Swiss-Prot record:
GO terms for biological process: proteasome-mediated ubiquitin-dependent protein catabolic process. It comes from Arabidopsis thaliana (Mouse-ear cress). It holds the Pfam family NPL4. This is NPL4-like protein 2. The keyword Phosphoprotein applies. Residues 131-272 form the MPN domain. Keywords: Phosphoprotein, Ubl conjugation pathway.
Amino acid sequence: MMMLRIRSRDGLERVTAEGAHITVSQLKTLIADQLQIPLHKQTLSTNRDLLLAKTPADLLAFTDLTDPNLPLSSLNLGHGSMLYLAYDGERSIPGAPPVTPAGSFGRKMTVDDLIARQMRVTRQETSHCDSVSFDRDAANAFQHYVNESLAFAVKRGGFMYGTVTEEGQVEVDFIYEPPQQGTEANLILMRDADEEKRVDAIAMGLGMRRVGFIFNQTVVQDKTEYTLSNAEVLQAAELHAESELKEWVTAVVKLEVNEDGGADVHFEAFQMSDMCIRLFKEEWFETEIMPDDDPKLSKMKKEVVVGVKDLKEVDNDFFLVLVRILDHQGPLSSTFPIENRSSRATMRALKTHLDRAKSLPLVKKMSDFHLLLFVAQFLDVSSDVPALAECVRLQSPVPEGYALLIESMANTC
């Protein structure tokens, strides 16, 4: 016997099969029997992007599991493998037996009971963010560090900055990494208010704003059972709620085993659901996570309604709304040493950076967020920092006063 994990809009479920020798047709029959989804409504794929399909035409692009006679073993699927499922319509998910009526002839309902019945947790189908596009240099600088320097052994995070279009498309053009302490399971942000003021001043001059948070999961996390852990959901909800931006994006970088047995770096993007943010703001989440707690479940202080059940533990997948990922080449580079890492930026690094491309105008050399942040330490945060960043945005000549200051800084090493 083997177990296959099936991820759909309803979350993560499991189907039991005899073995990898069964065909796609037999698997669909098992899904119909065990998950109550009719055969003719099922679309299966090994590609997670299936869950982003919005129209029947979109579903036609996923053809890897359309041959009914194809054995699962030919796709290297086995015990514990993940498949993605889309289906039309609604289904009834089995729940707890009905409760006895409240009132004179049943159990009395408290005010908390009534509030809980109004707090119904359902899957949010549509995100407020149409897509998120990562600047290639910024994304590569982040993933390269967690892969090559940290070996995905500890967690690392950063705030994403960029723009949001009227259509809800988010573009990420730089990633700011605050002071932090990462372990195998937790990420503690030791935020520096003064440094964040400088970051926001640079963003203002560039015509950008904070649009999300990115972090990596570690190789020791048991990611076979969850997309985000309970601790990750809490942190993501806290930062999303703090932002007050409805298009706020949470991005995850992870290492996944490929078909050849090697490992690939993979990006995923989500929005925390409206209900998740509401529950966080109204303090329904249990914020103390115990060692024995199941990481795929978020604990509530009071019962909420999930399906037909009153529960105090909610599958984390109910709080996640998948977001489509794109990429682009933005206006900034990411070649200057990045803040708050083990190797710190220095005046010598500034001189090396400026000397590297002597033929370029200074504004081109300054078109690097991490360099702007380093220089911003020596400028007035309310006037000089946004003014210098605006020069970068407009690609206009850097005023002589700033140019002389930057040159003198570089020459002190």
